[in-house]
Amino acid sequence: GDMVIHPRLVEDHVEHARRGHFSQGVRIPLDAHATLVQLAPSAGIQGSLAPGLGGLRRGYAFRLPAMSVLLRRAANSIIAIKSCNQGFWRRDLLAVNGFDEEMRGWGSEDKELCARLENAGIRRQTLLFAAIAFHLDHPPASRGSAAANLALWRETVRSGRTRCDAGIDRHRP
């Protein structure tokens, strides 16, 4: 994977889990140098002290769970949807049939899933200052499918659909 998670990430997702909501943790991008430091054998999660963090990225690396509770709705407008650090109730994810496998490659698959959840009445809560994960630097994936995926997301938003046809059900007995 391309993420290094805070040792208490799962605990944070469990602590903040609420029925009728899915959780979005924070993804903090690391630069090339910080990635090398994090991948060193002696490295541990350094949180806000991690090298290569500046400005807002350093601020997001502070773990302050009590503050997270106060900001979980307001932070939705600050933190983008990123499926690399989300928490769902199993029944909610099954109800919308998970990720739409019609989407190919990079782009909008996470936004499309969240749109279906919200269309189904499941609300997003952002865990700012909790559920922290660092994204390791690497060459970007091909954006060749981005426009087609974005069109699928827009159609989900426009139509209000809550389920996809090509999802988890394909893999269940």
Where in this protein do the model-derived segments appear?
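Short, flexible, basic/aromatic active-site loop/helix in glycosyltransferases
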Residues: S42-I79
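Short Asp/Glu-rich motifs
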Residues: A32, E112, L136-H138
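A short, conserved alpha-helix in the catalytic core of glycosyltransferases
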Residues: I81, N85-N97, M103-R123, L128-F129
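Conserved hydrophobic/aromatic beta-strand scaffold that supports enzyme active sites
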Residues: F22, N85-G87, A133
